[in-house]
């Protein structure tokens, strides 16, 4: 039964899932923006599709489980699972229809105008069809397997996110109608070249279907795609975490179907067959007018057409790093004073990877410990850890096996490092290790000294070129001691009694964040300067949100930049009129977590891995580090000033949960990311000794 979604949510909170969907709406608006380079618009369109895939695999899957279990309990925003699902269905259908229209009416014609022509087979010449027929017979036909349904043949297993054709064929002699499924091969390019033009792979298969069904009349074909539940839980009692995760990965392949995407042209009979065979509700079916799975548009984005893309950005080598004659000099520089790095404006390779290489090459280094949540295949960090192990240094890597959709990569990386002699630790079954921290121990005059890096982003060279993040390199003794204690807690399961400077979840981070908010509230009530500025990915935690409401009511000015989910309602009279919320999108993904609490003349700056969500504060190992170095604090202040001044790629959240783009032109235009790029270049030209 379809549940009508009444808006019974209390005014204090915005629904989490609906807030996330609006992230995709903002991305789609960028894709629609004609001022963006054409292939960047195509890229944003592809990201919308891949984002929705993950959303259905995890969030919608969980809501369906709750709804099927008749769990009518309302979430903190006031919606039941059924109401949330109906609201999601309506909004996702709107956005996917808008995405299809964008492709058909705008992007595809614009690409054709630049000689990237994606055509249907009916527009192909006889010569082009001959070439496609040869390609089909040589490269496609040998790997196709039509699977009939009925007459003793069960409905076939359909793998998650795979693209398929459903086919109805009639025997001309008996009039018997048969139904079959043909999977589109995953190892072939989605866009097939035919001369200077491109056609979709599934349309080539659809055109030559009679070859697969000789002696039958193909009466209907349509394209479909299923999304399966991909979330999993590992038992807290698991003796071998790696083995338990591997077992769950095998099970995940057979998760329940949570979404069926289907060509809008499919007949009702074909639709009914798929609904019955896949065991889904009619409300889980999404009609698609254009191509299914637009995430494959990345193939077009990868074309060598620089004039249709953003001008390439070459990360700057920060001046203090540029002066180093060898990687081993990094420790001398850190001793001179903390160094902050702002990615991707600053170079990841010249900073963090140089730090890791320095640990591997320096004969005075005796130990290196790090955390890995997501990393790249060509990671210099893992190479440095292996080199440390081969040199007889203590080399420890805490690998989070439950990093969603990177589980397989992390398992393989763990085994490779273990075989090379690295001590690999997988942490806890019930707590993800999400902290980004590295500890290097060095033998120096006067004894051992520890060096630390703590950041907001993953140690991943690929994403470091695309994601905006910050990190600090320090030899502060208290911070280093805290990091060492935390590593020992994770590897040895001892419980730290207290932390000197770090805020660590799930131990004291929540209470200390609330204490910082309260400190600002007290200052506001006393008539002193009181401001909170939060730059993060998501703000979901109801307790933190209520504390922010209270601080705003006390008179504090609160500015929030949330990239994705924001359940806080800004601008509500009597509740949150002193709170403003924005979101910034551009060529780089805003990923850093920077927190500033200003009370009177005292300001606390924090950076780290944690968003303001219950999972980050209560169910993960997370770290926030206070920034005390004056130059580093100035840099963070500049980042926040620019963030909250953007008038080019900022969206503003209204009290009703809607977002609107804040666009200015001429002298009033302030593009945050471009400002940061110019700032990095100017700093490098000046040889700024503070960085």
Please place each PLM-identified region on the residue numbering.
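N-terminal localization/anchoring segments of enzymes in phospholipid and broader phosphate metabolism
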Residues: 1-532, 550-554, 566-691
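Polyanion-binding catalytic cores of nucleic-acid enzymes and NTP/SAM-utilizing transferases
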Residues: 544
């Amino acid at each position: 039964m379809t549940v009508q979604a009444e808006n019974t949510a209390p005014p204090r909170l915005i629904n989490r899932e609906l807030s996330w969907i609006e992230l995709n709406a903002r991305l789609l608006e960028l894709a629609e923006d004609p001022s963006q380079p054409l292939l960047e618009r195509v890229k944003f369109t592809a990201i919308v599709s891949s984002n929705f895939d993950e959303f259905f695999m995890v969030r919608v899957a969980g809501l369906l489980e709750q709804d099927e279990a008749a769990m009518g309990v309302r979430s903190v925003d006031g919606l039941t699972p059924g109401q949330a699902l109906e609201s999601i269905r309506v909004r996702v259908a709107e956005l996917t229809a808008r995405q299809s229209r964008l492709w058909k009416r705008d992007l595809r014609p614009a690409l054709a105008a630049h000689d990237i022509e994606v055509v249907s087979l009916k527009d192909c010449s006889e010569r082009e069809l001959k070439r496609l027929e040869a390609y089909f017979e040589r490269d496609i036909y040998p790997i196709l397997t039509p699977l009939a349904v009925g007459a003793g043949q069960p409905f076939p297993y359909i793998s998650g996110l795979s693209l398929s054709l459903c086919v109805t064929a009639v025997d001309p002699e008996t009039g018997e109608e048969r139904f079959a499924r043909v999977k589109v091969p995953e190892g072939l390019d989605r866009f097939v070249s035919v001369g200077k033009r491109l056609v979709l792979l599934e349309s080539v298969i659809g055109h030559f279907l009679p070859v697969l069904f000789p002696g039958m009349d193909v009466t209907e074909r349509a394209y479909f795609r299923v999304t399966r539940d991909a979330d999993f839980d590992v038992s807290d009692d698991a003796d071998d975490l790696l083995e338990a995760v591997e077992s769950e990965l095998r099970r995940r392949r057979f998760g329940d179907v949570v979404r069926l995407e289907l060509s809008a042209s499919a007949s009702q009979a074909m639709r009914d067959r798929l609904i019955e065979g896949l065991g889904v509700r009619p409300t889980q079916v999404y009609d698609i007018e254009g191509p299914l799975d637009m995430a494959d548009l990345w193939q077009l984005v990868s074309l060598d057409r620089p004039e249709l893309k953003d001008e390439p950005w070459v990360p700057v080598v920060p001046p203090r790093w540029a002066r180093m004659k060898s990687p081993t000099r990094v420790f001398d520089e850190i001793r001179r004073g903390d160094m902050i790095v702002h990615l991707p404006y600053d170079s990841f390779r010249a900073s963090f990877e140089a730090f890791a290489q320095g640990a591997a090459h320096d004969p005075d280094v005796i130990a290196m410990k790090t955390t890995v949540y997501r990393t790249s295949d060509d990671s210099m960090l893992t190479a440095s850890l292996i080199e440390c192990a081969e040199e007889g240094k203590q080399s420890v890597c805490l690998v989070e096996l439950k990093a969603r959709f990177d589980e397989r990569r992390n398992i393989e990386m763990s085994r490779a490092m273990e075989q090379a002699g690295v001590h690999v630790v997988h942490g806890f079954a019930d707590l993800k290790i999400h902290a980004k921290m590295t500890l290097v121990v060095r033998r120096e005059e006067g004894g051992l000294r520890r060096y630390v890096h703590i950041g907001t982003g993953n140690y991943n060279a690929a994403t470091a070129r695309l994601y905006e993040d910050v990190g600090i390199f320090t030899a502060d003794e208290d911070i280093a001691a805290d990091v060492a204690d935390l590593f020992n807690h994770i590897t040895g399961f001892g419980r730290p009694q207290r932390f000197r400077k770090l805020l660590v979840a799930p131990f004291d981070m929540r209470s200390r964040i609330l204490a910082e908010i309260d400190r600002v509230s007290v200052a506001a009530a006393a008539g002193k300067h009181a401001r909170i500025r939060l730059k993060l990915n998501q703000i979901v935690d109801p307790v933190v949100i209520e504390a922010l409401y209270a601080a705003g009511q006390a008179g504090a000015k609160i500015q929030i930049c949330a990239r994705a989910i924001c359940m806080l309602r800004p601008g509500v009279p009597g509740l949150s009129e002193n709170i403003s919320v924005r979101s910034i999108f551009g060529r780089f993904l805003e990923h850093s977590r920077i927190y500033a609490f200003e009370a009177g003349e005292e300001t606390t700056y924090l950076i780290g891995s944690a968003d303001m969500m219950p999972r980050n504060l209560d169910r993960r190992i997370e770290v926030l580090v206070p920034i005390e170095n004056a130059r580093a604090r100035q840099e963070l202040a500049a980042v926040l000033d620019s963030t909250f001044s953007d008038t080019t790629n900022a969206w503003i959240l209204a009290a009703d949960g809607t977002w609107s783009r804040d666009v200015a032109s001429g002298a009033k235009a302030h593009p945050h990311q471009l400002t940061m790029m110019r700032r990095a270049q100017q700093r490098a030209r000046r040889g700024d000794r503070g960085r």
